[in-house]
Amino acid sequence: MKQRWLKDWPWETVVAINAGLCKEKNALHKPTTDGYKPAQKLWEEARFRELTLREAIQVGRRCHKLSPFCFYNGNTFAAIGRTLIQGIKLPPAKAHSFRSVVGHYIAGTIGDDELDQALRDLEQ
């Protein structure tokens, strides 16, 4: 099922989330010269498209890999990914597990196979 998963997440909100994470950890909040503009473009273009859930999660991972900020890219996009899926009706244990998979996938600590399995489990 495709929908506009990112429609309520303008780039300014992404920047604000990263700023908050950096402030909390006393880290520099600053855009990178190489990754900021490409990530912003990717994100903003995806916001207005209907995407599968997998595609929306992949946008977060791709933006993380572009490293638009000096610090906490993974945390920023993983937090958004985990929040995106809160509206999916799941039993508490399954919801917790799926949020974990989404966050770890976006952060790059697990791969496509694990995400695919978690998405298949949603359909059961």
Give the positions of each predicted feature:
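FIC/Doc superfamily catalytic core
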Residues: 1-124
